[in-house]
């Protein structure tokens, strides 16, 4: 007797039949036995099949299955939980005597996609990855499928109606890959794309469009027909209306063309209307979300710079009216039944809102039932969101989000550089503001974006599991995702893979690969470069260790592991390391240090390694990803790859006599000891009472032997080594470790009072003697726990290190239920250094002093007077069209001052320099004057408008 047989009605949708066959293939991958897929028309035939199997799996769709109707009539099942719903499914186990003791698993879908998701639920339970086809991941082996009645379930409606991705910026990577593997952009490639989308519980796709023509490349309409068969809802990109792509117009236009030769609704109105009409006639019969509106060719503004806002709005209003009439004529007389979308992308956002002088399109009759697709700023930060009043819009709202971008200030397209906590923080905000109708994410070439894409679509499908209630759950998601892909690996290896994923994405999102260059991280200050290099080494070592384990213990997973984990991690970290080393090379070259050449050699090795990684990726698994790594990614000097540069390295020629330079670690101070240059250096580390050790580094400047010796030091300080020789060849630098004995220092200090006392360190060099003053913090005040003390001339406080936190409540009129509690919560591992604080619920507005929540920080300074407070914030954008992203500051119970985190005239996008710096650095800084008293000060930071995310505070004179 067979363990499993799939049985389906002959009348079932062909797409469901194809998916059932794929799931049967999944069962074969797990058990090495492929179940048969049989068809019939009646319960009698089902009973006959039941004699031959332990379990018969019966997929069926409500409204398209006579079998479901009969079983419901006979009271064997109840479909009330799924009937009339969208994309729901139920698993019903039946064990009637007429089926000879055989277990029947009835997978009932509320519609085609519901049935498909129900089928793929079996694959999930068997440990089959959604990337089984895309990446070739084999599931763990099992002897039996082991279906049990306890697995019965009903899956509710997905949280977001339309959920999908956009294949974009596809040249040179995705396009090259398509041509080499599939001969173009036809059904042979979209077969895999559609399967991937459905396995990820998506339902909506924008196809490749730089050079592709989805409606022609199938060949012909084959792509569209295949999408319809699988239940994929198609759309065109944000600037391709009426089911026509920009490349189609390029291909069809001409002086003798019926479509004219100008993408201009004023001068070529009839030609453009004909072009749109033919697109609707060709593809309007399929399931689509039709893009409305009109932008310029190649993703540009439709009218020139001289056009007024009113000109643009009136043109767009005319376009929308015309398009709705065409849809009514060509698709459905009741245009309200046709899903339509207008993307408020870039300049179109301004046309929607208008200004004080010109009314925008908000509330326009032409948009009454149209989905309004809002957008991020192309760097993962949301732009405007619906106000409470706007959320009544019948068509609902969508969000166009980016994991890939081709545009100013710098493109990022090569490898995933997006971070899950960022996606969570932004997309939960979108959902809570009512953006629930459509989520579409730009995934570029798809390859290497599998991890964040999974998270995006899982959140869209089940917001209750991964949305607002899942604060600080991205690490858990990462572990689950790792288990989903590599379930046969040991738990220890799975944990290490999850650590690599979290580690590299957190580090890379701080500065994306294409935007990375020498000196982005300071070579010495705050150990920025050193700490980052050490973190890269840690992650790469772990990745290499796991890779070695995979090759030895699970070689059949090597290709998938490389594609999903190793290549993205190693590629991006190696690139970042290369630029960090280039920065060290340039810094040391300015000192004349021969050690700069070692860094230069290391840069060259990184560049070589970059080429090796891309080549190996292309060759892996018989060329499975050939072409996918082709995007330029090193040293962008413009927004795109034009004139991009490999790192510039400096070669230092040796001096012709013994010379060395003494540097104080973490500072730019250096000296050779010349008697003509007698200014002392200072080592400030021991001003921090928690500091026990510090460093001084000596670099050789010549290939002649250069001796040094510590000739004077405080007795409370140990130095090692005390002397040595640099030869400029095998030994061209020396690190001296300085360790303080604070007990001995306290016993031997001279009795002076104050904040610090100094020791002196002298180092004899070939050029003379270097003198280094070493101040030490003393007489620290006794302060309450949680109080920061100024010992080094500044105070740094992570946002999560508050002394007190006070809850507030939502301001009247801004959120339903004004007495709802609002409080700051910590988002762990989010931000440049440690974490971030944000007020929840995210839609709440606050009035400082009345209802706004606040964070309170305590700090001690020795001198009263004016200080500068620098706030480090996420580079968020205002959620409303008022250009306000506000917070309040209060020091020592004084006046609460309100500040806007963005300047007047704030501009997102092209030539918005303030915005650009924020998104490239992944941080926004704002300096504020504060008046402090001697002793303990109390600083409060209030949340005023949604979107304020605080990471760190710096106070200095």
What are these regions (language model features)?
Residues 106-109, 171-187, 206-215, 252-270, ...:
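The substrate-binding groove and active-site-proximal loops of carbohydrate-active enzymes
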Residues 131-183, 188-208, 395-398, 784-807:
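An acidic-aromatic substrate-binding cleft motif
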Residues 633, 637-701:
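Beta-sheet-dominated interaction scaffolds and their linkers
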